């Protein structure tokens, strides 16, 4: 009963010998699986060697700890020969956001992802309209 299927009574396939017949057919089914496993393993080993022995992380040089210069630098790269135009504070701030040592942008979550009440005492009660506080206390899970 080896190699027969439960479905269809175990009859031969109409095309003659299938891929699962004999040791060659078994190898043809396992070859792609083995090749995939070896490729993924080799990639993992190469990444481990690269990040462990070769790759060196680099950082941009830190700003000196001394006092800041009194004269501010121009907010954005000015074109040569064009006199600098005073820009509003918001515009100059947006030009400096990407500069090392400049202000960092304030990242905010979208309104749907923000926590509305960080303090549990400020959280509104789940009291429905026309419901007494005693009924709301009895409804809460213990």
Swiss-Prot record:
Protein name per UniProt: Putative transmembrane protein INAFM1
Origin organism lineage: Eukaryota, Metazoa, Chordata, Craniata, Vertebrata
Alphabetized PANTHER family for the sequence: TRANSMEMBRANE PROTEIN INAFM1-RELATED, ZGC:153157
Residue spans of biased composition, Gly residues class: 1-19
Feature: compositional bias, Basic and acidic residues: 117-142
Residue ranges, annotated region (Disordered): 1-22, 61-83, 99-142
Domain of life: Eukaryota
Main localization category: membrane
Keywords carried by this UniProt record: Membrane, Transmembrane, Transmembrane helix
Subcellular location: Membrane
Keyword Transmembrane helix attached: yes
InterPro entries, alphabetized: InaF-motif
The species this protein was found in: Homo sapiens (Human)
One GO location term (cellular component): membrane
């Amino acid at each position: 009963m080896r190699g027969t299927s439960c479905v269809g009574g175990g009859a031969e396939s109409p095309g003659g010998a299938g891929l699962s017949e004999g040791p060659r057919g078994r190898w043809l089914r396992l070859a792609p699986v083995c090749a995939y496993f070896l490729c993924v393993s080799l990639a993992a080993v190469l990444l481990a060697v690269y990040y462990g022995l070769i790759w060196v992380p680099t950082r941009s040089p830190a700003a000196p700890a001394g006092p800041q210069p009194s004269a501010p630098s121009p907010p954005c790269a000015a074109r040569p020969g064009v006199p600098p135009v005073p820009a509003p504070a918001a515009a100059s701030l947006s030009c400096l956001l990407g500069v090392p040592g400049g202000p960092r942008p304030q990242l905010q979550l979208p309104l749907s992802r923000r926590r509305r009440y960080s303090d549990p005492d400020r959280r509104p009660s789940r009291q429905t309209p026309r419901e007494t506080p005693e009924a709301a206390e009895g409804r809460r899970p213990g």
